[in-house]
Amino acid sequence: VSDLIGTELTDDIQRVRIEIGAGLVEIVPADGEQTTATLEVINGSAEDVTFKVTNGELVVELTKQFARRGPEVRVHIATPATLDARIKTGSGDISSRMPLGEARLSSGSGDIRVEQIAGSLAASAGSGDIRVGSSVGTVRASTGSGSIDIGEANDSVGVTTGSGDVRIGDAAGPTTVKVGSGDITIERIRDHSVVTSGSGDVRVELTEGPSVRAETARGDVQIGVPDGLPTYLDLKTVTGQIRCDLEPGEKPADGEPSLMLRARTVSGDITVVRV
């Protein structure tokens, strides 16, 4: 049984606060200048869900706790605005094709996909993936068994996964990545960074420093260093091999950019290449 509760047209929504179990939440661009919020409840009734706007905040939440499986709730928001968002789902996907401001997103077993964050982001998923196109502010993201993909981060980043891969495109701020079992790939590092994996490969395609620490217990480490950047190396592996393409150079002058690179692995190879 599908009960379509209705559509609310308003132009004064600045924030959304949504907490549902099963279902989905999606935010898309609007054709006009108004925000349209549509709610659909499946296997439930209108009385099961609060759906209202108060002081510029759209609120969607279940009105009671369900002993068994509750209704499936689908929330569709079309807006021209950059909304602040606090969204939590049990098993539903969260997606936004519009920029979000300050965002706190959480899902138990759904995926989180956001194209752009204008503020800061805190995102967590139990067994789903997290995808972020770009972020202006800080990013904190964690998954239990899903992957994390961040295209562009202009501020600090802290991400952790239990058993998923991590990919970051451009990391402009301080970056920390911790993975239990999975690969880490970062295309460009521009600030102090620490990346560690329990069992997986660590690959940094281009690192501009000023310091990078890359560690894995069972996996390979590969780091790309710009040609001509003075680099201090501290490389250690127990049973693997070390290959370094960098040429010995002079100590950098005072104020000259340099890189401190530390890499560790127990049973893998370490490769440092010029790029």
Where are these regions (language model features)?
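Intrinsically disordered, low-complexity terminal regions
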Residues: 1-275
